[in-house]
């Protein structure tokens, strides 16, 4: 029994994170030098994301009996994303107004160094709905795969899947090739995941070594407030949605515990995207639903990021004594409903969206971003964890609504009745 515990990815990642924290704290310079380990692991995962999405979506759509169900799944997913993201934005707004973490700081915006956030404000000026929609269309198919743009790959995969489905029996050879290729890709993922403890160790050692635990103290109230809000959202909002759908949020979190630890170590929810595709199929969701909901959710269903955006914007207003009445906050909410979709998939998207929002609202100082630039790294874990749980719950909800969920399989997997619960599966049945 002990041997199986020590060999489990869950234990190995947890141990790696602990060792990384200790190394970063006691030997900060050495901890900073561990950064390539974390970066390397995330790059390996990103290398495989595009082919995983392509294979999953194409085989899922091409293997469906009716194309009507694809449109129904997409519409249900987008409606769910918008409703739950709005709830996340509102919860962040309510909590930051009640706790008021920025009140009393009395920061003069003119004294802030805006040069540190100039790169984000410059990118923010280029964001918008039309540029975002145009960016979904790749200049070339090869370019979409080379850049790793999730939405571009998803668009091509959906079109390819539809075309393959229309070929009928003539397309079976291509379908079989892609399905076989999918098995190979998931085999590669299994190899990469063995390096997860090393990646988590390197990323955590670097974070603690560079920023130190002491940096959390100065703006600790905002960090604590944000973490508690994310916990509140997961267990109250997502927990209620899960209960209404017929499963326990606690059992689901236990089911994806390894993925959560990897995200905690790397601060990147993308690091477990391929593995989540596997696990959501294994839990009973049909491949076509998983292939559409998970990749799309990584751009449109960022619950943790939504909470962060409203809290950060109002915190800056409080810290700089910028007046925000109820109408200003409603305006902020409306702007965020649009802008939060505009920088999806962009590196540093949280800051870019926040900069764009502050500029759009007008009366909030964009230079105020400098206040949270230093602690943003410590809030990224909560954002990524909440985003991951939110996308997992969304997949099950949409699958059940579209009658593409095996509820007996869901109950068995979440209850741990399947002994191979955490084993990687090369492919899932559609």
Curated annotation (Swiss-Prot):
It is found in: Cell inner membrane. It comes from the Bacteria. Its main location: membrane. Pfam families: SDF (PF00375). InterPro entries: C4_dicarb_transport (IPR023954), Na-dicarboxylate_symporter (IPR001991), Na-dicarboxylate_symporter_CS (IPR018107), Na:dicarbo_symporter_sf (IPR036458). It is a multi-pass membrane protein. Responsible for the transport of dicarboxylates such as succinate, fumarate, and malate from the periplasm across the membrane. Belongs to the dicarboxylate/amino acid:cation symporter (DAACS) (TC 2.A.23) family. This is C4-dicarboxylate transport protein. It comes from Pectobacterium atrosepticum (strain SCRI 1043 / ATCC BAA-672) (Erwinia carotovora subsp. atroseptica).
């Amino acid at each position: 029994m002990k041997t199986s515990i020590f060999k489990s990815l869950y234990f190995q990642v947890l141990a790696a994170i602990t060792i990384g924290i200790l190394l970063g704290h006691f030997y900060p310079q050495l901890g900073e030098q561990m950064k390539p380990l974390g970066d390397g692991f995330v790059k390996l995962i990103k290398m495989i994301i595009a082919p995983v999405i392509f294979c999953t979506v194409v085989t899922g759509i091409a293997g469906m009996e009716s194309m009507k169900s694809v449109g129904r799944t997409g519409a249900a997913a987008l409606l769910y994303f918008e409703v739950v993201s709005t709830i996340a934005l509102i919860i962040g707004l309510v909590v930051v107004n009640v706790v008021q973490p920025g009140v009393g700081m009395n920061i003069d915006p003119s004294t802030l160094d805006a040069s540190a956030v100039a790169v984000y404000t410059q990118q923010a000026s280029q964001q918008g709905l039309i540029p975002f929609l145009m960016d979904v269309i790749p200049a070339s198919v090869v370019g979409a795969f080379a850049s790793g743009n999730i939405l571009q790959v998803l668009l091509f995969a959906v079109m390819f899947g539809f075309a393959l489905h229309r070929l009928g029996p003539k397309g079976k050879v291509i379908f079989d090739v892609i399905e076989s290729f999918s098995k190979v890709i998931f085999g590669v993922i299994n190899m990469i995941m063995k390096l997860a403890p090393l990646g988590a160790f390197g990323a955590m050692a670097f974070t603690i070594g560079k920023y130190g635990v002491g940096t959390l103290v100065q703006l600790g109230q905002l960090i604590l407030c944000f973490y508690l809000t994310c916990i509140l959202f997961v267990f109250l909002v997502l927990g209620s949605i899960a209960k209404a759908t017929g499963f326990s949020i606690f059992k689901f979190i236990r089911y994806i515990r390894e993925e959560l630890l990897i995200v905690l170590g790397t601060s990147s929810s993308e690091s477990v995207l391929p593995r989540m595709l596997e696990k959501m199929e294994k839990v009973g969701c049909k491949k076509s639903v998983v292939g559409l909901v998970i990749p799309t959710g990584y751009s449109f269903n960022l619950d943790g990021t939504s909470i962060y955006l409203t809290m950060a914007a109002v915190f800056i207003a409080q810290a700089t004594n910028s007046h925000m009445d109820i109408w200003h906050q409603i305006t902020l909410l409306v702007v965020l409903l649009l802008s939060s979709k505009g920088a999806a998939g962009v590196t540093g998207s949280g800051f870019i969206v926040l900069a764009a929002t502050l500029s759009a609202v007008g009366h909030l100082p964009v230079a105020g971003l400098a206040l949270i630039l230093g602690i943003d790294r410590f809030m990224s874990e909560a954002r990524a964890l909440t985003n991951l749980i939110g996308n997992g719950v969304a997949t099950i909800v949409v699958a059940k609504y579209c009658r593409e969920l095996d509820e007996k399989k869901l109950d068995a997997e979440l209850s741990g009745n399947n002994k191979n619960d955490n084993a990687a599966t090369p492919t899932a049945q559609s």
